[in-house]
Amino acid sequence: MQSLTLEQEFKLKVYKENLKKLTLKQSQKHLVEVLKQMMLKDNIIKYLIRNSYF
């Protein structure tokens, strides 16, 4: 796994602090949404790789 940039580390810290303010149910819903977005991102990357012409 790659290291995070300083900017990414900062964003992650802010994200963690905001998560602490959520209830368990809100956190679970948020986790599912984030995972869905990551899967969509993976699909886009796979599509772009398959359809690239290098």
Curated annotation (Swiss-Prot):
InterPro entries: NblA, NblA_sf. It is found in: Plastid, Chloroplast. One of its GO terms (cellular component) is chloroplast. It comes from the Eukaryota. It holds the Pfam family NblA. Belongs to the ycf18/nblA family. This is Uncharacterized protein ycf18. It comes from Cyanidium caldarium. The gene is ycf18.
